[in-house]
Amino acid sequence: MAGHSKWANIQHRKGRQDAKRGKIFTRLIKEITVAAKMGGADLGSNPRLRLAVDKAKAESMPKDNIENAIKRGAGLLDGVDYIECRYEGYGIGGAAVMVDCLTDNKTRTVADVRHAFSKFGGNMGTDGCVAFQFTHCGYLVFAPGTDEDALMEAALESGADDVVSNDDGSIEVITDPNSFSDIKDALEAKGFKAEMGEVTMRAQNETELSGDDAVRMQKLLDALEDLDDVQEVYTSAVLDA
């Protein structure tokens, strides 16, 4: 059992994502473009692209936008050449933070990320300072009340790596990142629809924060997520609302 406030954190994050829907299309188009550039335009052989396209469809992105982003990545249309970069650091209470960016100007991006860390009580570190604390994996979260035994059986039969039950009743299914979409589809076919699912960097150990520390940490995370060049923010912090 783990994470008494995990479900509250998940719900807050979903609320944050809904509140910034205006930026979601921009970020997804960047991700689709880079995924197609790195792994080709075939969804069947490019798990990263398939995942990005699935996210775009879930957000009701128009088909033309998706297809044009793929074409730009594959070099069939002109477009901005984005660079992938990752910055690492520490938040309140020493909580680990990783920030993934796609940018056409690394000088601007690193300055913006460093400023956000400094302004909101964090500390930007060196490459590799916290990356070892995270595992690259697929991550599905199911609501409290889900039949744990049935979900566990279905998940393991589908090839999941692990199933974790939380104190609040929510259940997490952990997968290999390249198998995420297939396992998600297999579970949905068996009647299990996740409240949230993504390929992510999952903290191996959590840093629980409460009270003023939790408020300050949320401000730091919000500031980082609001930066135009930021795609994802990962943290070991679990905030007690």
Curated annotation (Swiss-Prot):
Biological-process GO terms, alphabetical? regulation of DNA-templated transcription
- InterPro entries attached to this UniProt entry: Integrase-like_N, TACO1_YebC-like_2nd/3rd_dom, TACO1_YebC_N, Transcrip_reg_TACO1-like, Transcrip_reg_TACO1-like_dom3, YebC-like
The record's section on PANTHER family has: TRANSCRIPTIONAL REGULATORY PROTEIN YEBC-RELATED, TRANSLATIONAL ACTIVATOR OF CYTOCHROME C OXIDASE 1
Q: Which domain of life is it from?
A: Bacteria
Keywords (A to Z) from UniProt? Cytoplasm, DNA-binding, Transcription, Transcription regulation
Give TM regions.
Answer: none
Species lineage: Bacteria, Pseudomonadati, Pseudomonadota, Betaproteobacteria, Neisseriales
What Pfam families would the database entry show? Answer: TACO1_YebC_N, Transcrip_reg
Origin species: Laribacter hongkongensis (strain HLHK9)
Annotated signal sequence range: none
Official protein name in the record: Probable transcriptional regulatory protein LHK_02347
For this protein, the record's SUPFAM superfamilies field holds: YebC-like (SSF75625)
**GO CC terms, sorted:** cytosol
Task: Indicate where this protein resides in the cell.
Answer: Cytoplasm
Q: Name one GO molecular function term.
A: DNA binding
Return the NCBIfam families for the record. PRK00110.1, PRK12378.1, YebC/PmpR family DNA-binding transcriptional regulator
- Spell out the family assignment given in the record's similarity comment: Belongs to the TACO1 family.
